[in-house]
């Protein structure tokens, strides 16, 4: 409802526009069907192997929290705070630019000074926190599950982090948004040269 009230649902999200461009380059003509397939695939992934960390944690037979669980949940909570702060800083920046009647400016304040996409990095770390917290539960399944099933669950658990990284950087996150930012923001290319795309770090001196 908030997005609708702000008029954000009146046009296609940039990441979907970018997907259409990618499909056209790969000679996919039925982009509407491709969009439906991708949406269904994302829903299936979210309801299956991407949910494995949550399934493991919720089905844990362990009575007390282990060290890994405490570390994982701490990373989870800190990452949520990190993402919230990043979103707040971006929103505050946009409001200030609107107040000053400045358009197409680059947000490089706060967390955005250290990575071009602190919100995506934080979201990835949220998943990593859950993965770490689920490891003790996964280990406890060794005696109750078949060896091959146990190994397959472990592989899926490891790939959850990798898949989320690829998704947040290349498919629906950083790269698609930068495709348009570089076109409409004159200073964005300079920002790209000086600031890491995903992992936080100090600015590069050219």
Cite the ranges covered by each PLM segment:
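Intramembrane catalytic core of multi-pass membrane enzymes that act on lipidic substrates
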Residues: 1-60
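Hydrophobic transmembrane alpha-helices
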Residues: 43-89, 98-206
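Membrane-interface helix/loop boundary segments of multi-pass membrane proteins
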Residues: 92-94
């Amino acid at each position: 409802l908030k997005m609708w009230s702000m008029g954000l649902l009146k046009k296609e999200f940039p990441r979907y526009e970018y997907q259409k461009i990618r499909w056209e380059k790969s000679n996919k003509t039925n982009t509407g069907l491709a969009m439906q397939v991708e949406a269904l695939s994302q829903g299936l992934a979210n309801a299956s192997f991407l949910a494995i960390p949550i399934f493991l944690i919720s089905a844990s037979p362990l009575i007390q929290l282990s060290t890994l669980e405490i570390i994982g949940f701490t990373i989870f909570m800190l990452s949520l705070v990190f993402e919230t702060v990043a979103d707040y800083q971006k929103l505050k920046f946009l409001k200030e630019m609107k107040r000053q009647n400045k358009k197409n400016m680059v947000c490089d304040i706060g967390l955005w000074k250290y990575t071009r996409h602190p919100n995506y990095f934080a979201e990835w770390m949220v998943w990593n926190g859950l993965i770490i917290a689920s490891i003790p539960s996964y280990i406890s399944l060794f005696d109750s599950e078949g060896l091959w099933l146990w190994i397959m669950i472990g592989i899926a658990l490891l790939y959850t982090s990798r898949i989320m990284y690829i998704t947040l950087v290349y498919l629906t996150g950083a790269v698609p948004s930068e495709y348009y930012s570089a076109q409409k923001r004159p200073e964005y290319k300079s920002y790209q040269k000086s600031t890491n795309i995903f992992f936080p770090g100090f600015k590069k001196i050219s």
